[in-house]
Amino acid sequence: MKEKRLYVAYGSNLNLYQMKFRCPTAKLIGTGIVKDHELQFKGRSDCAFATIAPSEGGAVPVAVWELKESDEKSLDRYEGFPSHYFKQEIPVEMNNGKTISGMVYIMNLRQSFGVPSKGYVQTVSEGYRNCRLDMSVLKDAIRQSVSRYADLISDRLINSIGFEQISLFDFDTADVDLDEDSSEADEDEYFDFLGEDEEITDSFIPTQ
């Protein structure tokens, strides 16, 4: 009979209800941190999932589960192993002061940063509450991942356009109709369209 295995959860599998459904015989051992790592959200642009990556000085709060062989096989299916996530052993500093080694799922490195769905964030945040973990780590991870995703999209857009510098001497002002009254009218129409009290926001972070 195969020995039981310790599994390190940092995302949606912190959620006690979800784990009870996925792995009915799994047993929660305790909580701790994975040092020198950070929590990230990667995958599809509008449906990213949690993963962890090396980051000097970082710390990811985790829960440690004891799995039977049937539990691990079930998680392999849910986590998309080995195509979406791979496994490795990782040290965990438990809250009781002990250091253990457990199996963790890590997303394949080809994936880019993305935005997690509202439902997924709710599942993970409930897990954080279940295990009494530091919610600020989750919030910071969402902000950082969304910011990196936005930077990635901006870079792709800029590189695809290929901006060219144009000299003022390339224009013949004689061919340009400079109608000051028309310009002012167009400007007034533009600001009337926006409205004085209109507030423009640009936030990708899902609300909880």
What do these predicted ranges mean?
Residues 1-207:
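Glycine-aromatic micro-motifs
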